[in-house]
């Protein structure tokens, strides 16, 4: 029997009309006899590094319990995303109608047609689960690839010129370096820059999204 497990479901993140690879992480669990052995953190680190090798830019999740917000925070996640209630009547609408709705948001974790179909079937099994959610639920998001995330930011802020030093990402050490933003482009370096603004991977997430909070919907948890 396995000691721990999780699943990372591929999604596309839409940010101001630009698409980026994303993943929704769910089902993280550790068998009772293997708890308090740092196995969960190790599994998350492996998952994050694997997602990085796949070219993923962001990972998202919804903590099952309030106390898990702090635990996921130590894994690099921030509370910079919310899960919206399901659109009224979504289960009887077409995917095309739902797709127009989801793409009306500036920053959202997109569902494809298959994922929408799964959510509709899940609704048929337990409609109360969807109808009971009236307010947005706090989710969490993590930057998997700092350079790709900053490239999205730079393309929307072509007048921005600055250097960022990302530090302390233990799950994805490749993110820890200097990033220079200029004229809509991003370059990396390991040469010290005294003018660099130092950020953790969590602070970088808040910097990139700012007041524009990403959203997601119809996530199975």
Model-predicted segments: where are they?
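Conserved acetyl-CoA-binding loop-helix of GNAT-fold acetyltransferases
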Residues: 27-30, 36-49, 74, 128
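Conserved GNAT acetyl-CoA-binding A-motif
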Residues: 44, 51-64, 131
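C-terminal functional modules
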Residues: 134-221
């Amino acid at each position: 029997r396995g000691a721990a497990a999780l699943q990372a479901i591929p999604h596309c993140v839409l940010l101001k009309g630009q698409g980026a690879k994303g993943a929704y992480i769910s089902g993280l669990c550790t068998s009772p006899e293997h708890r308090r052995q740092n196995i969960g953190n190790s599994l998350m680190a492996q998952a994050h590094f694997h997602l990085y090798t796949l070219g993923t830019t962001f990972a998202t999740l919804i903590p099952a319990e309030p106390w898990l917000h702090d635990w996921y925070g130590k894994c690099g996640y921030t509370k910079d995303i919310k899960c919206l209630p399901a659109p009224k009547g979504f289960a009887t609408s077409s995917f095309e109608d739902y797709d127009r709705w989801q793409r009306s948001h500036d920053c959202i974790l997109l569902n494809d047609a298959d994922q929408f179909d799964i959510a509709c079937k899940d609704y048929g099994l337990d409609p109360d689960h969807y109808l009971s959610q009236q307010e947005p639920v706090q989710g969490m998001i993590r930057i998997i690839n700092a350079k790709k995330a900053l490239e999205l930011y730079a393309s929307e802020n072509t007048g921005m010129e600055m250097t960022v030093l990302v530090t302390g990402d233990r799950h994805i050490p490749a993110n820890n370096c200097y990033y220079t933003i200029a004229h809509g482009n991003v370059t990396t370096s390991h040469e010290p820059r005294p003018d660099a603004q130092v950020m953790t991977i969590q602070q970088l997430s808040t910097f990139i999204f700012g007041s524009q909070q990403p959203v997601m919907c119809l996530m199975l948890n």
